Curated annotation (Swiss-Prot):
Name of the encoding gene: pepT
Enzyme class: hydrolase
A cellular component term, taken from the record's GO annotations: cytosol
Protein name: Peptidase T
Family (UniProt): Belongs to the peptidase M20B family.
Record text on cofactor binding: Binds 2 Zn(2+) ions per subunit.
InterPro entries reported in the protein's UniProt record: ArgE/DapE_CS, Bact_exopeptidase_dim_dom, Peptidase_M20, Peptidase_M20_dimer, Peptidase_M20B
GO molecular function annotation: metallopeptidase activity; tripeptide aminopeptidase activity; zinc ion binding
Active site: D80, E174 (proton acceptor)
Length: 410
């Protein structure tokens, strides 16, 4: 446990921001640099089957220390950080024994205030790790990596704690939706796994959005503005019309819980061609299909109003709700719940309003719910984590490993 924070503060010094514009895997060189450093650490822990492949997938195993059959379980985390904010030159602040009030984030002019982030009100007396207001922190998901490795180190140092084979997997490019693309489930060797990629203490998740990307491409005609009358068709005006046709109350900022949404995430604008990048999210397959149909209907309406072929829609499914793949294996949820309760953590079962590697892995034959890291406000400069939350995550991983072995003892 004593090295947990030290590990984390070291890991966030690696710039591992993934790059959606690069089709290589991993999409950024910093991820390989980080993976190579982690590999050395896993070798130093005397784990077996330590391997780092050319695509940046790092795997290892802690062998069973019991003399009866126990299913191999896995713990998975991702090495990249989100492209939404810089992950370079991260300068964490450690706030000991937080007593309330606003936390200034370095000299950036940014701050964490309870009025904007009410979770702070429940964290009095905790030790917080924040950013300096210029970068994200990288708790998503380097906290998960630090917690997994710290739990494995604890099990190595305490061989009286019984466990079966424990498989470890660290993936690249999760934040850009590719984390599981080249994950070798058979090589990994676990019967089921858990991503350690959740937020506040207690989170246990096995439902996530069905996800589709939707690109709306608007075609115009560019003519010199001085002679444009009756000739120019400005694709930016078409794009603006399309956005105004979308349901205004079905966006991320207007939805919560099990509500789905449309999200205009990017726009590339020009007179001759404009492209709007949307993501569609819904917890039900039927819901996401209905949302696709709504977008197609809006495209058809615009084409009828303007000129056929001015607007086109390209839909790409990204991932699906893991619930249908995890629910038949209720014991893996129950083991995680009981491990949390044993560690004085109240399980908070809630849907993931996003996706994880576990969603894709579940459809690849590796059921994979998600467990908390203790972090908050991922993907931005206001990200922070509590040291106590990280410690509780380590305890849950250790207890879950032990409880699985006990469960299968005859």
């Amino acid at each position: 446990m004593e090295k947990l924070v030290e590990r984390f503060l070291n890991y966030v010094t690696f710039d591992t921001k993934s790059d959606p514009s690069n089709q290589q895997c991993p999409s950024s060189p910093g991820q390989i640099t980080f993976a190579e450093a982690l590999k050395l650490e896993l070798v130093a822990l005397d784990l077996v089957d330590v391997s780092l492949d050319d695509n940046g997938y790092l795997m290892a195993k802690l062998p069973s220390n019991v003399d009866y059959p126990v299913p191999a379980i896995g713990f998975v985390a991702h090495m990249d950080t989100a492209p939404d904010a810089s992950g370079a030159n991260v300068k964490p602040q450690v706030i000991k024994d937080y007593r309330g009030g606003t936390i200034e984030l370095g000299e950036s002019g940014e701050s964490l205030s309870p009025s904007q982030y009410p979770d702070l009100d429940s964290l009095h007396g905790h030790d917080l790790i924040t950013t300096d207001g210029t970068t994200l922190l990288g708790a998503d998901n380097k906290a998960g990596i630090a917690e997994i490795i710290s739990a494995i180190a604890y099990l190595k140092a305490n061989p009286d704690i019984k466990h079966g084979d424990i498989c470890i997997g660290f993936t690249p490019d999760e934040e850009i939706g590719r984390g599981a693309n080249l994950f070798d489930v058979e090589k990994f060797g676990a019967e089921w796994a858990y991503t350690i990629d959740g937020g506040p203490v207690g989170e246990l998740e096995f439902e996530n959005f069905n996800a589709t990307s939707a690109d709306v491409i608007c075609h115009g005609v560019n003519v010199h503005p001085g002679t444009a009358k009756g000739k120019m068709v400005n694709s930016m005006n078409i794009a603006a019309q399309f956005q105004l046709m979308m349901p205004a109350q079905e966006t991320p900022e207007c939805t919560e819980g099990y509500e789905g949404f449309y999200h205009l995430k990017s726009a590339e604008m020009g007179v001759a061609r404009s492209e709007l990048g949307y993501i569609i999210r819904d917890f039900e397959r039927e819901g996401v299909e209905a949302r696709k149909a709504v977008m197609q209907q809006k495209v058809d309406e615009l084409n009828e109003r303007l000129e056929k072929g001015r607007v086109e829609l390209v839909l790409t499914d990204s991932y699906f709700n893991m619930k249908e793949m995890v629910e038949p294996h209720q014991h893996i949820i129950e083991l995680a719940k009981q491990a949390m309760i044993e560690c004085d953590v109240e399980p908070m079962i809630k849907p993931i309003r996003g996706g994880t590697d576990g969603a894709r892995l579940s459809f690849m034959g590796l059921p994979c719910p998600n467990i908390f890291t203790g972090g908050y406000n991922f993907h931005g400069i206001h990200e922070f984590i509590t040291i106590q939350g990280m410690e509780q995550a380590v305890k849950v991983i250790v207890e879950l490993s032990q409880r699985t072995a006990t469960h299968y003892q005859k």
